[in-house]
């Protein structure tokens, strides 16, 4: 998982060092000591200083104090163990608040001096109430630990699992808390895998089969709770008569692929979804019922949607209470630069897209054209990295070649050509969001004609703007070497 960790009073012993400095200075200023031992804050009523005296001392000394802070018991050891267990460590601190000369380098040097491991250091302004939650969303943080009630509430409001590190000043808040690093480590260890649902139009194109394979090769990251079959109409590749026919064929292909993956135990969690699009789907279906059941059971479930988003929209329509319990990563539409959304997953069910976008669900949108379209590969690359000694790899190569050649009108079309495995993007995003460049934006309005109208004051969603193609394929090909 991707863990966001605050520094002061979470990793560092900020308050204990600050208190020592206040007591020391008070001897020369008043020599009255602590006048209110019940005060929650050192700087608010604990000493009988004036506001001006407090502000002057704090301003003149905070940088010196910050540089010599110690580490809370167990913090370094537990962070090391979390890193070793495969978690990504994001240090997210509000020190870019005008109180320090060079806050980034000061913080980096302190972390290095104390041998604190981290994958990424992020600074925000502590006085910006949304500063941390914006960075959490942009970096796909799964869990945040902080001492600030305000920061934790903002994260919770944006469906980010959050824990308070217990301090005297935050005990009034009814927010899940931990009292030590040992306790935090135990909590994380018990919830390490991401609970996911794959919503897929498996028979529509071959990239769905690559995506399911990638997911099943990444079960160290994912706890797959269901595979739900999304509707699709006749495409350029799949030869289907009706949506219902496509659903049946998607179901069969999914079961066959699970056998080939030696994961037949997952065949019992494959569920058929809508056979009509959102507007005409009056009745529920087993996929929608299962999405609702799983969402209500878990604290957070991520739906990896790589087809028309009908099943997700129907689940939200029937059970809006799940909105705060799910995260949707959807491959669909195009970037704003293209000025159109004539893309297969989007155009099939615009009403479903409108429903999901308007619902305020936690949403990550991976556009197809100009983003996922970068995930192109060739016959020669696949044949090089997918050993034909492995039956599954040979099968994937064969269906890729068959699909690619079906779009060729004459032999010369193969020269210098490639094909995109679009659906790998959604799986890769949840494996490592650092392979993507994303932006937190005001949710666009989806017009009836399928276009976006950009906004400035709606709820926030994440749009992916770019991806690191080589990082994703490197991870995929390495995993495909495993039997």
Region spans (language model):
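N-terminal acidic, glycine/proline-rich low-complexity segments
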Residues: 190-483
């Amino acid at each position: 998982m991707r863990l966001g960790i605050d520094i002061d009073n979470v990793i560092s012993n900020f308050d204990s060092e600050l208190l020592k400095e206040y007591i020391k200075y008070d001897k020369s200023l008043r020599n009255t000591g602590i006048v209110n031992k019940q005060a929650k804050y050192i700087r608010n009523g604990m000493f009988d200083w004036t506001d001006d005296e407090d502000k002057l001392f704090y301003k003149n000394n905070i940088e010196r104090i910050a540089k010599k802070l110690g580490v809370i018991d167990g913090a370094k050891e537990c962070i090391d163990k979390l890193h070793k267990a495969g978690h990504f460590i994001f240090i997210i601190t509000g020190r870019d608040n005008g109180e320090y000369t060079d806050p980034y380098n000061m913080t980096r040097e302190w972390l290095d001096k104390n041998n604190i491991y981290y994958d990424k250091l992020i600074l925000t302004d502590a006085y910006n109430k949304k500063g941390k939650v914006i960075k959490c969303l942009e970096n796909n943080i799964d869990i945040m630990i902080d001492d600030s009630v305000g920061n934790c509430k903002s994260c919770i409001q944006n469906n980010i699992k959050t824990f308070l590190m217990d301090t005297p000043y935050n005990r009034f808040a009814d927010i899940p808390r931990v009292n030590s690093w040992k306790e935090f480590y135990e909590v994380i260890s018990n919830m390490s895998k991401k609970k996911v649902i794959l919503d897929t139009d498996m028979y529509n194109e071959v990239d769905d089969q690559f995506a399911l394979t990638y997911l099943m090769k990444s079960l160290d990251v994912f706890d797959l709770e269901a595979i739900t079959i999304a509707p699709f109409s006749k495409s350029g590749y799949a030869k289907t008569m009706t949506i219902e026919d496509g659903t049946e064929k998607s179901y069969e292909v999914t079961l066959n692929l699970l056998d080939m993956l030696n994961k037949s135990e997952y065949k019992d969690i494959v569920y058929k979804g809508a056979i009509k699009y959102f507007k005409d789907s009056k009745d529920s279906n087993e996929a929608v019922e299962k999405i609702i059941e799983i969402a209500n059971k878990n604290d957070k479930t991520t739906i990896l949607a790589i087809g028309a988003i009908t099943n997700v929209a129907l689940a939200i329509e029937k059970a809006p209470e799940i909105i705060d319990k799910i995260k949707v990563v959807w491959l669909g539409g195009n970037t704003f630069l293209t000025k159109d959304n004539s893309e297969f997953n989007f155009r099939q069910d615009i009403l479903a897209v409108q429903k999901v976008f308007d619902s305020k669900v936690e949403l990550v949108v991976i556009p197809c054209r100009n983003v996922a379209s970068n995930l192109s590969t060739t016959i020669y690359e696949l044949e090089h990295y997918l050993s034909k000694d492995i039956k599954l790899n040979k099968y994937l190569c064969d269906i890729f070649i068959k699909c690619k050649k079906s779009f060729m009108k004459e032999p010369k079309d193969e020269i210098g050509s490639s094909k995109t495995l679009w659906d790998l993007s959604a799986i890769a995003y949840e494996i490592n969001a650092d392979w993507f460049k994303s932006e937190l934006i005001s949710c666009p309005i989806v017009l009836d004609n399928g276009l976006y109208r950009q906004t400035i004051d709606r709820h926030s969603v994440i749009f992916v703007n770019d991806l690191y193609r080589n990082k994703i394929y490197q991870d995929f090909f390495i995993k495909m070497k495993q039997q």
